């Protein structure tokens, strides 16, 4: 994060790209693989595209592992833990779930025995999708102490991050949304 901040201080010729829990949307997670497939038809290798895709595909797994490790440090298992996922959309301040890493993260957490709720101001409910059948309703941002961990997956501008950190037992931040907030409760991944 600090390297990106330094690089974007350049007055021209820099486009910041921020790491997170995985890629989403209608083009970035899919289109490079089309290019790779097409290149193979002409006997070209696109190893860098494939490596980037591999890293991006594994980020939800990395994020879930960060949650499990953060809970373990608090002497709490992921199995049976109450988790609140903040943000469903694939990027901040939009209502688009296409290829969202949040859905994969929720599914992975549930498969490991976590009791998962979500909050997203753009999605009062989420149900059957192309790949996921979550059938969930947006949980209010009240009584955050009931959750063993709050996971920031989408950094919507509507969220009051200082308040979320203050009221939570543990926060895993996958988007650097808590930048500038100093608390032992925060785990940044």
Language-model region placement:
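Structural/interface elements that position substrates and couple domains in central-metabolism enzymes
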Residues: 1-189
